[in-house]
């Protein structure tokens, strides 16, 4: 494959950005800290492709970190947005589009009987934690090592995503009193969760988790794990919360809870439901959601919540996803991609394990299986950094971190998958010891 060697404009722009923004970026993982080198600066995106400011084209497997499941700048989405923007960018008042997207979410997601729109996944998780505590009258919450629920103080305990990428223990500026009620357990370890419940009787408001971990790499639940959490929370009068910001509408139309047949009490959403615009949502049983203001006493608000542009993009995206055969195609191309990646590594004598669920995939450069964050950390991060550079040179844009899942879209064709597997084969050959 043709090598990309010219990053002159990207380097100039990023150099200037470092004087203007912390680390030169608006979100830490974009800075390429864990893979080395300087980040490329994007100019435009379309379908499965991204172009940098130097004119280089890449096959993109980040998809704006998950929202672009229909492909970048899908014509039906952009046309709908062009029509909507003529009516205004934000109302700060109720609009009919909120009703329509709410109905679509409620119809699709098994746990959701009522929904509140916010502006990000972090906001959704912050609000849902407050709601968990208010509904149960309990302060403690259980999360899992490596699971990421946004950058709110109470969740920055053994968190994944950028915290894992940068090797940070947690974050300075978070008082111990803020996280004192946040308990942690290894993912896929039911016994550890049972122990926390026994040590904290009648004190745990609930358990929150990514049903498929995507912010500590790609880790799937062991058989019986989600079912076991459902039983434990019910037995202890606690709530079960699925953070489906990443998995919602990506691994099936009804998310992970539909895919695995386990229904939580509350769900957080984001990414896909905004079609590429800033959005978040949380929802669940009516008796719980009725506690949210103004119906109830649990306060939460947002200036741009439910704005017409995000609602428009979300509605059109979900309409596209609901078409026949959508998830069959995503299953097919993504499983073929990860099988090709694994085969390429094995052909070159490189330890690897990985997998996929519909339009979400990931791999670790280590012997497997990987069932939790501790095992994920055995991944060869240095080798991944070399792989990332080789793939970038060959026009393949992977997440610049070994602790992030990858994403496919409806715009990725067999041709893009073939080229990507070829690039992996060449890159593994280039970095093998």
From Swiss-Prot:
Domain of life: Bacteria
InterPro entries for this protein: 4pyrrol_synth_GluAld_NH2Trfase, Aminotrans_3, Aminotrans_3_PPA_site, PyrdxlP-dep_Trfase, PyrdxlP-dep_Trfase_major, PyrdxlP-dep_Trfase_small
Enzyme kind, highest EC tier: isomerase
Gene Ontology BP terms: chlorophyll biosynthetic process; protoporphyrinogen IX biosynthetic process
SUPFAM superfamilies in the cross-refs: PLP-dependent transferases
Subcellular location: Cytoplasm
Catalyzed reactions per annotation: (S)-4-amino-5-oxopentanoate = 5-aminolevulinate
Record key words, sorted: Chlorophyll biosynthesis, Cytoplasm, Isomerase, Porphyrin biosynthesis, Pyridoxal phosphate
Modified residue annotations for N6-(pyridoxal phosphate)lysine: 271
UniProt pathway: Porphyrin-containing compound metabolism; protoporphyrin-IX biosynthesis; 5-aminolevulinate from L-glutamyl-tRNA(Glu): step 2/2; Porphyrin-containing compound metabolism; chlorophyll biosynthesis
One annotated GO molecular function: pyridoxal phosphate binding
EC number: 5.4.3.8
Names of required cofactors: pyridoxal 5'-phosphate
Cellular component GO terms held in the UniProt record: cytoplasm
Subunit architecture: Homodimer.
Family indicated by similarity: Belongs to the class-III pyridoxal-phosphate-dependent aminotransferase family. HemL subfamily.
Record PANTHER family: GLUTAMATE-1-SEMIALDEHYDE 2,1-AMINOMUTASE (PTHR43713), GLUTAMATE-1-SEMIALDEHYDE 2,1-AMINOMUTASE 1, CHLOROPLASTIC-RELATED (PTHR43713:SF3)
Protein name, per record: Glutamate-1-semialdehyde 2,1-aminomutase
């Amino acid at each position: 494959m043709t090598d990309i060697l010219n990053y002159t404009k990207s380097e100039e722009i990023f150099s200037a950005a470092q004087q203007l923004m912390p680390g030169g970026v608006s979100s830490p993982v974009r800075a390429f800290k864990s893979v080395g080198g300087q980040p490329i600066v994007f100019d435009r995106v379309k379908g499965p492709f991204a172009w940098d400011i130097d004119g280089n084209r890449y096959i993109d497997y980040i998809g704006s970190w998950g929202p672009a499941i229909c492909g970048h700048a899908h014509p039906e989405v952009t046309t709908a947005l062009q029509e909507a923007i003529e009516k205004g960018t934000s109302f700060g008042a109720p609009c009919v589009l909120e009703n329509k997207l709410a109905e679509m979410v409620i119809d699709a997601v098994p746990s959701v009987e009522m929904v509140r729109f916010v502006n990000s996944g972090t906001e959704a998780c912050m609000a849902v934690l407050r709601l968990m505590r208010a509904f149960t009258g309990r302060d403690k919450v259980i999360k899992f090592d490596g699971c990421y629920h946004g950058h709110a103080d109470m969740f920055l305990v053994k968190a994944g995503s950028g915290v894992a990428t940068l090797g940070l223990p947690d974050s300075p500026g978070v008082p111990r009193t803020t996280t004192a009620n946040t308990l942690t357990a290894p993912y896929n370890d039911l016994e550890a969760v049972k122990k926390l419940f026994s040590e904290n009787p009648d004190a745990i408001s609930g358990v929150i988790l990514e049903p498929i971990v995507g912010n500590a790499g790609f880790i799937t639940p062991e058989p019986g794990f989600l079912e076991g959490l459902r039983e434990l929370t019910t037995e202890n009068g606690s709530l079960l919360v699925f953070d489906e910001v990443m998995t919602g509408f990506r691994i099936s139309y009804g998310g992970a809870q539909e895919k695995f047949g386990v229904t939580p009490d509350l769900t957080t959403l984001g990414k896909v439901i905004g079609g590429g615009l800033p959005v978040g949502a949380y929802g669940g049983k009516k008796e719980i959601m009725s506690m949210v203001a103004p119906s109830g006493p649990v306060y939460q608000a947002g200036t741009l919540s439910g704005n017409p542009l995000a609602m428009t993009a979300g509605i059109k995206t979900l309409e596209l996803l609901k078409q026949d055969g959508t998830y069959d195609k995503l299953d097919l191309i993504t499983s073929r991609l990860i099988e090709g990646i694994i085969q390429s590594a094995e052909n070159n004598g490189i330890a690897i394990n990985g997998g996929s669920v519909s339009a979400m995939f990931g791999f670790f450069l280590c012997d497997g299986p990987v069932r939790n964050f501790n095992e994920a950390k055995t991944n060869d991060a240095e080798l991944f950094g070399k792989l990332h550079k080789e793939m970038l040179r060959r026009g393949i844009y992977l997440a610049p971190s070994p602790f992030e899942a990858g994403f496919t879209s409806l715009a990725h064709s067999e041709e893009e998958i073939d080229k990507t597997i070829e690039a992996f084969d060449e890159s593994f050959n280039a970095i093998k010891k």
